[in-house]
Amino acid sequence: MEHHKTYHSANIKTATGSLLIEGPVSPEDLAGYEFHKDLTAFRPPREQHEALVDIAGLPEGRIIIARDGRTIVGYVTYLYPDPLERWSEGNMEDLIELGAIEVAPDYRGCAVGKTLLTVSMMDEQMENYIVMTTEYYWHWDLKGMKKDVWEYRKIMEKMMNAGGLVWFATDEPEISSHPANCLMARIGKNVSQESIEQFDRLRFYHRYMY
């Protein structure tokens, strides 16, 4: 499968000025930008910056960023699922994972996350994929957002809806371990019925084992 990447962008207004939401961004451009010091949800900022550059260099990898001048203040990543997870077991070339989305605290509350997802889906290539994401409450910044689990889940779900992702049932053990955890996905209009059925088998692994 060829992974065509077509650049799109949008501007959003914030209290301190305008932000550029853009992507997919090349590894070279990503490496040349500053990385906001408060983007620490997954790794220390320098390590996460390097990880984004690596993902952008993958054939299927996509990084959409929010940029204030030359500083990255938010991002969303897309790539094939981790080989250790069940979602990679079918070796589906048209199943990609929204692996991480993060916005620096100073830039929250002005639809940066929603716009990152909206710009992501502007590329016609996304209609060839099933885009999935797994949401686990232990990754959520409940303290920083001053929200309980269910309030945060509602915010997260609404943000994902902006990119066309909706809730899907699954028997995956980690997701099933807490009712706030969830699987969300968007099935592109060009995805084959065969791939949809394969995704169903991955979602309900135990049902199809017997």
Swiss-Prot record:
Residue ranges constituting the N-acetyltransferase domain according to the UniProt record: 20-161
GO biological process, one term: sporulation resulting in formation of a cellular spore
Enzyme class, UniProt record, top EC level: transferase
Pfam families on file: Acetyltransf_1
Family: Belongs to the acetyltransferase family.
The protein's name: Acetoin utilization protein AcuA
EC number: 2.3.1.-
Role description: Part of the acuABC operon, which is possibly involved in the breakdown of acetoin and butanediol. Acts as an acetyltransferase inactivating acetyl-CoA synthetase AcsA via acetylation at a Lys residue.
Annotated source species: Bacillus subtilis (strain 168)
Temperature dependence as stated in the record: Optimum temperature 37 degrees Celsius. Thermostable. Retains 93, 78 and 15 % of its protein acetyltransferase activity after heating to 100 degrees Celsius for 5, 30 and 60 minutes, respectively.
Induction info: Expression is maximal in stationary phase and is repressed by the addition of glucose to the growth medium. CcpA protein is required for glucose repression. Acetoin does not act as an inducer. Up-regulated during the 80 to 100 minutes of spore germination and into the outgrowth phase.
Ways its activity is controlled: Activity is sensitive to salt concentration, a high concentration of KCL (500 mM) is needed for complete inactivation.
Gene3D superfamilies, per the entry: 3.40.630.30
Keyword Transferase: yes
GO MF terms, alphabetically ordered: acetoin dehydrogenase (NAD+) activity; acetyl-CoA synthetase acetyltransferase activity
Domain of life: Bacteria
Alphabetic keyword roster: Acetoin catabolism, Acyltransferase, Sporulation, Transferase
Disruption phenotype: Does not impair growth on acetate. Disruption together with other acetoin utilization genes acuB and acuC results in poor growth and sporulation on acetoin or butanediol. Triple deletion of acuA, acuC and srtN improves the growth on acetate but it does not reach that of wild-type under low-acetate conditions.
Pathway: Ketone degradation; acetoin degradation
Subunit structure and binding partners: Monomer.
pH dependency: Optimum pH is 7.5.
